[in-house]
């Protein structure tokens, strides 16, 4: 005879969730940013309710919103869902692809306002750059640390071709871009007892791609949606001093010598000419990521200037002139330079403009001004 549980008895899963969360419905140890997903490519018919109905299958949502034009109230083609814990975010990402209201959508880990200005912040890549690793750090140390995030395909600990000495950085490739997104959204990484800088590894083509997204539509700037995408109307990924445009990341003539891809500064002074990991020829040749010219940690102002990456957190900062000059990039996210929210003295303002005071501000494809995720103001 089947014994049914008494009415109202919590199921094991829901009980576990309650124990894991605080009184407010989420684990207080997990920042909201880590529990939030950006959902791109939404149908214009999708509402807050239909978005919630779909994504709450993988956990309890503490927030769900479809972003709309403040005047017309028309959907901008993207939204955000916030779960009660990171475990539920992982479950939703493992369930890809997602279809909402008959349309396949693109969920990604939400990028904070401060991180959205970094080159390639919204690009989909499967490789990370790991800087600041010491001589005693071996491949197995990197594998032991990063395999908890996802399946690793390759690990490359870069060495000097002639001496065989480690050059202080490595590349790790995963089988899923979401693993990379999850890693880079976490600010601090301690590997083999050393603080390390971890960011997306972008090729020259991917750096250029971050700037080339600007032309697909000129409206108010959806993320991969209709009417604007990553760029367009003056002040998004590409124009007016932002990703790839004049005075912006990877643009010609901006970025201050030594900032992300500006003019001949390369990738924050990793090298010259071009904006890949420091220069035309590639990782290890002249001007490259740690090459014989102004590379990573060599003389001439590479990653950390003359002192190399060892200057990290010890007053050396990144690139001799910091992130493009004019200030310090502290604690992986707070820029204390001369310009508002800029990584150095670049024209045209920071990506997304000034803070909108909104939890959704400062990200994907601002329409200029006080922009956030595709909007001037919320």
UniProtKB/Swiss-Prot annotation:
<feature type="modified residue" description="Dimethylated arginine; alternate">
    <location>
        <position position="52"/>
    </location>
</feature>
<keyword id="KW-0597">Phosphoprotein</keyword>
<feature type="modified residue" description="Omega-N-methylarginine">
    <location>
        <position position="257"/>
    </location>
</feature>
<feature type="modified residue" description="Omega-N-methylarginine; alternate">
    <location>
        <position position="246"/>
    </location>
</feature>
<feature type="modified residue" description="Omega-N-methylarginine; alternate">
    <location>
        <position position="226"/>
    </location>
</feature>
<feature type="modified residue" description="Omega-N-methylarginine">
    <location>
        <position position="76"/>
    </location>
</feature>
<protein>
    <recommendedName>
        <fullName>Heterogeneous nuclear ribonucleoprotein A3</fullName>
    </recommendedName>
</protein>
<keyword id="KW-0488">Methylation</keyword>
<dbReference type="GO" id="GO:0005654">
    <property type="term" value="C:nucleoplasm"/>
</dbReference>
<feature type="domain" description="RRM 2">
    <location>
        <begin position="126"/>
        <end position="205"/>
    </location>
</feature>
<feature type="modified residue" description="N6-acetyllysine; alternate">
    <location>
        <position position="134"/>
    </location>
</feature>
<feature type="modified residue" description="Phosphotyrosine">
    <location>
        <position position="364"/>
    </location>
</feature>
<feature type="modified residue" description="Omega-N-methylarginine; alternate">
    <location>
        <position position="216"/>
    </location>
</feature>
<dbReference type="GO" id="GO:0003723">
    <property type="term" value="F:RNA binding"/>
</dbReference>
<feature type="modified residue" description="Omega-N-methylarginine; alternate">
    <location>
        <position position="214"/>
    </location>
</feature>
<feature type="cross-link" description="Glycyl lysine isopeptide (Lys-Gly) (interchain with G-Cter in SUMO2); alternate">
    <location>
        <position position="134"/>
    </location>
</feature>
<feature type="modified residue" description="Phosphoserine">
    <location>
        <position position="375"/>
    </location>
</feature>
<keyword id="KW-1017">Isopeptide bond</keyword>
<feature type="modified residue" description="Omega-N-methylarginine">
    <location>
        <position position="354"/>
    </location>
</feature>
<keyword id="KW-0508">mRNA splicing</keyword>
<feature type="modified residue" description="Asymmetric dimethylarginine; alternate">
    <location>
        <position position="239"/>
    </location>
</feature>
<feature type="modified residue" description="Phosphoserine">
    <location>
        <position position="116"/>
    </location>
</feature>
<dbReference type="InterPro" id="IPR012677">
    <property type="entry name" value="Nucleotide-bd_a/b_plait_sf"/>
</dbReference>
<feature type="cross-link" description="Glycyl lysine isopeptide (Lys-Gly) (interchain with G-Cter in SUMO2)">
    <location>
        <position position="151"/>
    </location>
</feature>
<feature type="modified residue" description="Phosphothreonine">
    <location>
        <position position="124"/>
    </location>
</feature>
<keyword id="KW-0507">mRNA processing</keyword>
<keyword id="KW-0007">Acetylation</keyword>
<feature type="cross-link" description="Glycyl lysine isopeptide (Lys-Gly) (interchain with G-Cter in SUMO2)">
    <location>
        <position position="4"/>
    </location>
</feature>
<feature type="compositionally biased region" description="Basic and acidic residues">
    <location>
        <begin position="21"/>
        <end position="34"/>
    </location>
</feature>
<feature type="region of interest" description="Disordered">
    <location>
        <begin position="336"/>
        <end position="378"/>
    </location>
</feature>
<keyword id="KW-0539">Nucleus</keyword>
<keyword id="KW-0677">Repeat</keyword>
<dbReference type="GO" id="GO:0005634">
    <property type="term" value="C:nucleus"/>
</dbReference>
<feature type="modified residue" description="Phosphoserine">
    <location>
        <position position="112"/>
    </location>
</feature>
<keyword id="KW-0832">Ubl conjugation</keyword>
<dbReference type="GO" id="GO:1990904">
    <property type="term" value="C:ribonucleoprotein complex"/>
</dbReference>
<feature type="domain" description="RRM 1">
    <location>
        <begin position="35"/>
        <end position="118"/>
    </location>
</feature>
<feature type="modified residue" description="Phosphoserine">
    <location>
        <position position="43"/>
    </location>
</feature>
<feature type="modified residue" description="Phosphoserine">
    <location>
        <position position="358"/>
    </location>
</feature>
<dbReference type="Pfam" id="PF00076">
    <property type="entry name" value="RRM_1"/>
</dbReference>
<feature type="modified residue" description="Asymmetric dimethylarginine">
    <location>
        <position position="286"/>
    </location>
</feature>
<feature type="modified residue" description="Asymmetric dimethylarginine; alternate">
    <location>
        <position position="226"/>
    </location>
</feature>
């Amino acid at each position: 005879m089947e014994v049914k549980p008494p009415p109202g008895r919590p199921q094991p899963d829901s009980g576990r969730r309650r124990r894991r969360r605080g009184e407010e419905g989420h684990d207080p140890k997990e920042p909201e940013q880590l529990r939030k997903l950006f959902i791109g490519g939404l149908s214009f018919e999708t509402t807050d309710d239909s978005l919630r109905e779909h994504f709450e299958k993988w956990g309890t949502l503490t927030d769900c919103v479809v972003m709309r034009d403040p005047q017309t109230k028309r959907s901008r083609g993207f939204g955000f869902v916030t779960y009660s814990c990171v475990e539920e975010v992982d479950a939703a990402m493992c369930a890809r692809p997602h279809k909402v209201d008959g349309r396949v959508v693109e969920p990604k880990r939400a990028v904070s306002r401060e991180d959205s200005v970094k080159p390639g912040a919204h690009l989909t890549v499967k490789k990370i750059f790991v800087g600041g690793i010491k001589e005693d750090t071996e491949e197995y140390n990197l594998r032991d640390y990063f395999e908890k995030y996802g399946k690793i395909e390759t690990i490359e600990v870069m060495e000097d071709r002639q001496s065989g000495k480690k050059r202080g950085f490595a590349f790790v490739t995963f089988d899923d871009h979401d693993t990379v997104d999850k890693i880079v959204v976490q600010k601090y990484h301690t590997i083999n007892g050393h603080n390390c800088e971890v960011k997306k590894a972008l090729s020259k083509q991917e750096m250029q791609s971050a700037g080339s997204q600007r032309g697909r539509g000129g409206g108010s700037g959806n993320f991969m949606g209709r009417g604007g995408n990553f760029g367009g109307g003056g002040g998004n990924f590409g124009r007016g001093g932002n990703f790839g445009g004049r005075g912006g990341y990877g643009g010609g003539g901006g970025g201050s010598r030594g900032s992300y891809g500006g003019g001949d500064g390369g990738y924050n002074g990793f090298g010259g000419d071009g904006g890949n990991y420091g220069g035309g020829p590639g990782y290890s040749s002249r001007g490259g990521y740690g090459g014989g010219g102004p590379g990573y940690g060599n003389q001439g102002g590479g990653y950390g200037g003359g002192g190399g990456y060892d200057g990290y957190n010890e007053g050396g900062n990144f690139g001799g002139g910091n992130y493009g000059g004019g200030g310090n990039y502290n604690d992986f996210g707070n820029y204390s330079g001369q310009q508002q929210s800029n990584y150095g003295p670049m024209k045209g303002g920071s990506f997304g403009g000034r803070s909108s005071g909104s939890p959704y501000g400062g990200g994907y494809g601002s329409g200029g001004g006080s922009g956030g995720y595709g909007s001037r103001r919320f």
